[in-house]
């Protein structure tokens, strides 16, 4: 359907009552539109399971949009534009469904009568389980796309073991897809492109998965592959399919069996031959050695096909552009005689035939060898030296030049074609006017004469090139080209030397011989190595780059035509002098026939081309720079020196004097006894607390724990007073404890005289003993300081024992291993708690020790108190 038909349809559709969306509008739930919908602003459809547009959906201008969002968690979602509808989109159409699950289905069916998209259509869909339960189709009757069609994925479905889910099918058999825009495929494992694809600027980008193409024609569009994507053609098309992005991991599949492939590095065409022939333009620059092919089985629409795969195992070349191939001679470039053949004798201008191109010894046809600038024969088209006329063809003596043997119109010059002159030289002495050179022989496309380079006849030779030469016979009839030869443009330099001489009365000017400037048009197309088999003589068999149009014979050549026939009285060869006319004999006898001229010398062999200069040697790569040496790590800092520990010795404790406990009794002559016992207090030796220095061994000094000196208590004897009928209590002296044994016997107390009431009382005697045993033990441990890297050791042990007999000594040592701890026993004065009855044992708690019982001391105090009272 033409664009006029499309526009007419939409104009007609606008006459129908329509729903116009002029402001942003949101509709919720399922929607069915039986009227035309024209969206000028935006239309959003939310939370529906189906959206149906049964008539025209028009989205314009480019800022307008329609967004259809599927209801969350819905199992079946449908968006439909049926055949009764039409779609005209200049803005944006988005269809979105993110639901997944084993039972999830989606039916996106866009099959309107006409779909004209100049904007953007996006299918944003999650992956559903199979295409048998879901339907994704874009297949309008008329498909016209100059915009963008996106198919993208927004979710993943794992319940698809056969990888057949979400297959989007675009087009159908018998319909045409006019795609001037872009189609992006990036959501599924497979896509189908069906029908006939046309237009010259469209592109189909396969960004994920496998694109299957089943088309009758594929015109103008480019298929762009991406990483690990593939392309399959189910049947061959007559066009060359343009494919880009072919590299590692890509596959190009062509249905058919017994497949083979070839790659033309000059044209970039990959040709696959199976039951049919597939041609893919993948670009130049690939290495055929890095391509591989294999036969596989392909599944398409439920059917299995034998398929040939081509894998490209190389990156994309940096430049895919192919060099201009000018060596093809197109069929339209017909070669017409344009160079006049001018014999040395008078040849009428009408019989001049101009060659349109010359053949180089290197078998290349160069544009410079043409007489007229218009006949530009490309230099790359070559007729190889092997396609030369075999030297066995010779001019028969009896043959006359008959131009009637025309160059066949069917003869074409291919790079492989050989020159086959069909004209035979016959002995008639005239060039028959009926002979014509037909210029209709076209040069085939394989020899690089471009269509624009037909040789235009520069003489009076008609298109039928009928040569009617009223040529005056000239003995030295050499064919001389009027065109100036360029020595660089090598021409067939060995014109056929006519060996058949004609009598002076009717010499034949060999105008039908192939001159250096008039190449014979070949009648067959052969490979470059095929030798031409001339049907007659007058064909050059060698090429001479040094020959010019002077009519002089060429230098000897190994490939020159060697004359094999001769005739008497004829013209000599190029170098031979014509024989003298016979003298009339007597009685009118003809003179002797002239001797034939010496045979022309073969042309000089072509000089070999200069040897190619060797390529410049590759420069060595710059030497790698050594890596920078690693910097040594910073030296560790030594630890700060530790301070020596200050060890202090245990302190000394002076024991308190022991209180003497004495008792006295007086009974007449009875003697009193007194004894006292003093408990010395233990000195508390404090251990020095040595601090551990960091890294320095301290000299730990032992603390000197002094033992407290235990003083013996002085036990006073109670003074016994004599009373009536009572013996006075003698008071004992306070005996001092001996410094040696700590035990002293008190001197007997002096009794007082008897009282008046007891005049007869006798003097009492008293004795007192006092003992004091001091016990003091202190222990302490202290760690010495680490100093001067010498480990110090020290322990602190203070012990002391005091007695009247000896003085305690203190020892102390320090240890580095542990802090010294000091245990001290401190003896404090007993304090009797208020209200304590005499004789009661008082328990006093001391710091750092247990409890001490002082019952004996109480007894002594009671005795002293009694004496005071008395």
From Swiss-Prot:
Keyword Disulfide bond: yes
Regions of compositional bias (Gly residues) in chain numbering: 567-576, 642-652, 675-721
Comp. bias intervals (Low complexity): 331-566, 577-641
Induction comment: Induced during biofilm formation.
GO BP annotation list: cell adhesion; extracellular matrix organization
Subcellular localization, as worded in the UniProt entry: Secreted, Cell wall
GO MF terms, alphabetically ordered: cell adhesion mediator activity; extracellular matrix structural constituent conferring tensile strength
Gene3D superfamilies hit by this protein: Hexapeptide repeat proteins
Glycosylation sites: 224, 669
Keywords annotated in UniProt: Cell adhesion, Cell wall, Disulfide bond, Glycoprotein, Secreted, Signal
Biased composition (Polar residues): 724-735, 792-801
Alphabetized InterPro entries for the sequence: Collagen_superfamily (IPR050149), Trimer_LpxA-like_sf (IPR011004)
Domain of life: Eukaryota
Signal peptide start and end residues: 1-18
Disordered, as annotated region: 329-835
Disulfide pattern: 284-322
Task performed by this protein: May play a role in cell adhesion.
Protein name: Adhesin AWP1
Annotated organism of origin: Candida glabrata (strain ATCC 2001 / BCRC 20586 / JCM 3761 / NBRC 0622 / NRRL Y-65 / CBS 138)
